From Swiss-Prot:
This is Major capsid protein VP1. It comes from the Viruses. It holds the Pfam family Polyoma_coat. GO terms for molecular function: structural molecule activity. The modification Phosphothreonine is found at residue 343. Keywords: Capsid protein, Disulfide bond, Host nucleus, Host-virus interaction, Late protein, Phosphoprotein, T=7 icosahedral capsid protein, Viral attachment to host cell, Viral penetration into host cytoplasm, Virion, Virus endocytosis by host, Virus entry into host cell. Residues 347-372 are annotated as: Disordered. It is found in: Virion; Host nucleus. The keyword Phosphoprotein applies. Residues 307-372 are annotated as: C-terminal arm. GO terms for biological process: endocytosis involved in viral entry into host cell; virion attachment to host cell. GO terms for cellular component: host cell nucleus; T=7 icosahedral viral capsid.
Length: 372
């Protein structure tokens, strides 16, 4: 018998299919002329002096006020206008769903972003009334230099933050969202490393200090963040800028951040270093604004809030709040719960423990051996 001359086409290997992202069931893309949109926005820096004005305060808009160095480790008093903060904003996108009772809904999905720091050329100013490069009255004014921190994020919900400080004895002003503000407890030495209870969401502009809060790598499933840090007291700022660089926001499964509630969340922090006053009379953080151009597309998703759950929530809220003995958790007083469904033949051993786990798999355990 002759062998066939043709070879069968190779079959591609199957890959995991993503069905859940950020608590939302992911379905197909929406096609059509109006299925893609672009959003342009910018975020101004929040370096401490966060509001424009006149006089001394207005002069340092985009800067911090002069940094005060404390005299001891345990007496570290921190003023709100001396710290750089994260900038953030929520952009309300066009509403996609008129009927929220359907099983499937449309959501905006962030696909890519073009972003750059604006105003880098302003750092060429060496003729201002600043600290001289040589002696007191000789040389040019020192340009902005020192520690730099650059970070931006695009997400479908507020950025998740993890708190960590250098000195837990620091006392932050009430206007600052500190670890104590979030947890309601005074900081301890555990806050100088990773404390899983010190978590927050970036929900306020110019209130979360960079020296306390950073993006939480264990969360942010529905956000994308990028950043870099360069330390040092005399480090020159190094920046690149172009309108041709596009950052893709899709993950390995081809899904980007899904904008819950038709909201797009932008976050940024761009610290360029310190501006030093004449004769080193004061040191000020200097920040610059960041520009965003975000491309979004529509995607079908499974309705995460079906009408039945909303009605059940409304029904349960009508009941009075009860404070009784624990029936859930580690101290639960429930001994056994049996749920029956359908019928089956009589089991040979009534003591066999049969159950279905959270993955829907059936398990059978033999009865425990009685104690002697």
């Amino acid at each position: 018998m002759c062998k066939p001359l043709w070879k069968p086409c190779p079959k591609p290997a199957n890959v995991p299919k993503l069905i859940m992202r950020g608590g939302v069931g992911v379905l197909d893309l929406v096609t059509g002329e109006d299925s893609i949109t672009q959003i342009e926005a910018y975020l101004n820096p929040r370096m401490g002096q966060n509001k424009p004005g006149t006089g001394t305060d207005g002069q340092y808009y985009g800067f911090s006020q002069s940094i005060k160095v404390n005299s001891s480790l345990t007496a570290d008093e921190v003023k709100a206008n001396q710290l750089p903060y994260y900038s953030m904003a929520k952009i309300q996108l066009p509403t996609l769903n008129e009927d929220l009772t359907c099983d499937t809904l449309q959501m905006w999905e962030a696909v890519s972003v073009k972003t750059e720091v604006v105003g880098v050329g302003s750092l060429l100013n060496v003729h201002g009334y600043g600290s001289r490069s040589e002696t007191k009255d000789i040389g040019i004014s020192k340009p902005v230099e020192g520690t730099t921190y650059h970070m931006f994020a695009v997400g479908g919900e507020p950025l998740d933050l993890q708190g960590l400080v250098q000195n837990y004895n620091a006392n932050y002003e009430a206007a600052i969202v500190s670890i104590k503000t979030v947890t309601g407890k005074a900081m301890t030495s555990t806050n100088q490393v990773l404390d899983p209870t010190a978590k927050a969401k970036l929900d306020k502009d110019g209130r979360y200090p960079i020296e306390i809060w950073g993006p939480d790598p264990s969360k942010n499933e529905n956000s994308r963040y990028y950043g870099n840090f360069t330390g040092g007291t005399g480090t020159p700022p190094v920046m690149q800028f172009t309108n041709t660089l596009t950052t893709v926001l899709l993950d390995e499964n081809g899904v980007g951040p899904l904008c819950k509630g038709d909201g797009l969340y932008l976050s940024a922090a761009d610290v360029m270093g310190w501006y030093i006053e004449y004769n080193s009379a004061g040191w000020h953080w200097r920040g610059l604004p960041r520009y965003f151009n975000v491309t979004l597309r529509k995607r079908w998703v499974k309705n995460p809030y079906p009408v039945t759950s909303l009605l059940a929530s409304l029904y349960n809220n009508m009941l009075p709040t009860i404070e009784g003995q624990p029936m859930e958790g580690e101290a639960a007083q429930v001994e056994e719960v049996r749920i029956y469904e359908g019928t089956e033949a009589v089991p040979g051993d009534p003591d066999v423990n049969r159950f279905i786990d959270k993955y829907g798999q059936q398990h059978t355990k033999p009865p425990a051996k009685p104690a002697n």
